[in-house]
Swiss-Prot record:
<feature type="binding site">
    <location>
        <position position="220"/>
    </location>
    <ligand>
        <name>L-aspartate</name>
    </ligand>
</feature>
<protein>
    <recommendedName>
        <fullName>Aspartate--tRNA ligase</fullName>
        <ecNumber>6.1.1.12</ecNumber>
    </recommendedName>
</protein>
<feature type="binding site">
    <location>
        <position position="486"/>
    </location>
    <ligand>
        <name>L-aspartate</name>
    </ligand>
</feature>
<dbReference type="InterPro" id="IPR004524">
    <property type="entry name" value="Asp-tRNA-ligase_1"/>
</dbReference>
<keyword id="KW-0648">Protein biosynthesis</keyword>
<dbReference type="InterPro" id="IPR004115">
    <property type="entry name" value="GAD-like_sf"/>
</dbReference>
<dbReference type="InterPro" id="IPR047090">
    <property type="entry name" value="AspRS_core"/>
</dbReference>
<keyword id="KW-0963">Cytoplasm</keyword>
<feature type="binding site">
    <location>
        <position position="479"/>
    </location>
    <ligand>
        <name>ATP</name>
    </ligand>
</feature>
<dbReference type="InterPro" id="IPR002312">
    <property type="entry name" value="Asp/Asn-tRNA-synth_IIb"/>
</dbReference>
<dbReference type="GO" id="GO:0003676">
    <property type="term" value="F:nucleic acid binding"/>
</dbReference>
<keyword id="KW-0030">Aminoacyl-tRNA synthetase</keyword>
<feature type="binding site">
    <location>
        <position position="229"/>
    </location>
    <ligand>
        <name>ATP</name>
    </ligand>
</feature>
<dbReference type="InterPro" id="IPR004365">
    <property type="entry name" value="NA-bd_OB_tRNA"/>
</dbReference>
<dbReference type="InterPro" id="IPR004364">
    <property type="entry name" value="Aa-tRNA-synt_II"/>
</dbReference>
<feature type="binding site">
    <location>
        <position position="445"/>
    </location>
    <ligand>
        <name>L-aspartate</name>
    </ligand>
</feature>
<dbReference type="Pfam" id="PF01336">
    <property type="entry name" value="tRNA_anti-codon"/>
</dbReference>
Length: 582
């Protein structure tokens, strides 16, 4: 070993011993006859001291040529610091240097490698190996490792078996686009990278493995949005002979265990609400329940009026913003513009200020008298000083628009703390949704999700009303995990394929291996997958998943460090039998 200790472990009890440290130069303070060097590794920082008449002249001379981020080895004695630094774990001691070796030089970094840096995100991604030297990112990667460690411990304690599934698989329809990989050996044929190990984990249940898990890489060729990664990691799980209630119980306890083991936070029992309730109360299937401001329906109260924006609306609903009756015209205009940009409702944003003296200020006052507005306020649990914001339109569009407005106000008014965690289960999702572009039903989750037993007969008459045996785990408005009870009966699976518009031949070609497997004794089974990157970000109290991924892509899906994606050589193109269109 080139060192005897790390830069984070020496304390007062080590005074008098000779040690050798290795690391990067964080900072140098040169007073001429006295030089201090802060030496850093991933364990911490230790101060080195070099002093005229004590340190050898050749070492003092050598120090004049050392810069930030040089890699050095220093040997010396541990001594007590005269001016202690209580903010550093090693702040009571320093190393009186006896010998020093430069292990490698370093160019001046393009940004500060410190707790707080001056580098922009794109620059730091270009030099990710330098950004990863910074303590916050190293702390995030260590947290990620800790979450994985505890996840494995819990699952293996509960008899789950870790099984690796293939990364080169068959491309199947549905969901996001696949990343495809051309086969050189089989010209004009392609593999796909898995969007999830879904089919393989179901086949493992058919194989009798009973309980499976995997921390799995997944790939989705989606249009890029902020904080989406084309490759991401799932904690993927599947179980045989279970009900939905069993899975919710096991993985609620799993989540509680992870939070307590990693950050010593004890979570209360998770509430469970239906998809319909989530949309009705929060305007989203991923509700943040850390704060109130629930959606309140006003349709029956206001529909019999001459106010044109309300006359044709299927839903009229609003939110009560506590203590914001003093919002300015500009603030209200900004909210109106925000709603307009969502392009969900044709009506504008209607506001009602419930003033401190009990009167109302609203552009709808000419259509509704004080008595009617008082009923609105009562329905919305408003008191003087509150602001009512109301939208009207189609049911789902109005709910979604109000849900988005609710979250915008959450952020503007700083209504929540990242230190508070509010998990809940959302269940009873629609099994199918109608796609206008393709003029067919598509699976809301995937085509292997089981419908609720009592809704199966509706598949042939009202497919859009069928509910799924599906569930999502949501924490602080983020979907952390999702899963379902799967179909294990061939006839029902083929019926679902038919409702989705697959011909018998298409279904056979794409999924025949799965339906064949169901004929050999497939057990009832279900599962769940956690977004591992998102789980780490929530636990780490960050909004973005990027700080918890060692080498992430940017918002355009590019690796700006390796310059990927990139072109390939003509020889590679020729070997793959690919013709590129211009």
């Amino acid at each position: 070993m080139l060192r005897t200790h790390t830069c984070g472990e020496l304390r007062l009890q080590h005074i008098g011993i000779s040690v050798t440290l290795c690391g990067w130069v964080q900072k140098i303070r040169n007073k001429g006859s006295l030089v201090w060097i802060d030496l850093r590794d991933r364990y911490g920082i230790t101060q080195l001291i070099l002093e005229e008449h004590i340190t050898a002249p050749e070492i003092l001379s050598q120090v004049q040529h050392i810069g930030r981020e040089y890699v050095i080895q220093a040997t010396g004695s541990v001594i007590e610091r005269s001016a202690k630094n209580p903010s550093m774990p090693t702040g009571d001691i320093e190393i009186e240097v006896k010998s020093l070796t430069i292990l490698n030089t370093a160019k001046t970094p393009p940004f500060l490698i410190e707790e707080q840096t001056d580098g922009g995100e794109e620059l730091r991604m270009q030099y990710r190996y330098l950004d990863l030297r910074r303590p916050p990112l190293q702390k995030n990667l260590l947290l990620r490792q800790l979450v994985a460690q505890h996840a494995r411990a819990y699952l293996e304690q509960h008899h789950f078996v870790d099984v690796e599934t293939p990364l080169l698989i068959k491309s199947t329809p549905g969901g996001a686009r696949d990343f495809v990989v051309p086969s050189r050996i089989h010209p004009q044929q392609f593999y796909a990278l898995p969007q999830s190990p879904q089919i393989f984990k179901q086949l493992l249940m058919v194989a009798g493995l009973d309980r499976y898990y995997q921390i799995a890489k997944c790939f989705r060729d989606e249009d890029f949005r902020a904080d989406r990664q084309p490759e991401f990691t799932q904690i993927d799980c599947e179980l045989s002979f279970v009900t939905q209630a069993d899975i919710l119980h096991i993985f609620e306890n799993f989540t509680k265990y992870i939070f307590e083991a990693t950050i010593q936070v004890r979570l209360d029992k998770f509430p469970c609400i239906t998809y319909a309730e989530a949309m009705q109360k929060y305007g989203t299937d991923k509700p943040d329940i850390r704060f109130g401001m629930r959606l309140i329906e006003l349709t029956e109260l206001v529909k019999n009026s001459e106010f044109p924006l309300f006359k044709q609306a299927k839903l009229i609903a609003g939110i009560c913003v506590k203590g914001c009756a003093d919002y300015t015209r500009k603030q209200l205009d900004d909210l109106t513009e925000y709603i307009k940009k969502l392009n969900l409702v044709t009506s504008g944003l209607v506001y009602v200020k419930y003033l401190a003296d009990g009167s109302f200020n609203s552009p709808v006052s000419k259509f509704y008298d004080v008595e009617q507005l008082t009923l609105w306020a009562k329905q919305m649990h408003a008191v003087p000083g509150d602001l009512l914001l109301i939208l009207a339109g189609e049911i789902e569009a109005t709910q979604i628009a109000l849900g988005s407005l609710r979250l915008k106000l959450r952020d503007e008014l700083h209504l929540v703390s990242k230190d508070k965690f509010a998990p809940l289960w959302v269940v009873d999702f629609p099994l199918l949704e109608w796609n206008e572009e393709s003029q067919r039903y598509v699976s809301r989750h995937h085509p292997f999700t089981s419908p609720k037993q009592e809704d199966i007969e509706l598949l042939s008459t009202k497919p859009e009303t069928v509910r799924a045996n599906a569930y999502d785990l949501v924490i602080n408005g983020m979907e952390i995990g999702g899963g379902s009870i799967r179909i294990h009966d061939r006839a029902l699976q083929e019926q679902i394929f038919n409702v989705l518009g697959f011909s018998e031949e298409e279904a056979r070609q794409q999924f025949g291996f799965l339906t064949d497997a169901f004929e050999y004794g497939a057990p009832p089974h279900g599962g769940i997958a956690f977004g591992f990157d998102r789980l780490c970000a929530i636990i780490g109290r960050e909004d973005s998943i990027r700080p918890f991924i060692a080498f992430p892509k940017n918002n355009a899906g590019r690796d700006v460090m390796m310059k990927a994606p990139s072109t390939i050589t003509e020889q590679q193109i020729s070997e793959l039998g690919i013709i590129l269109s211009k």
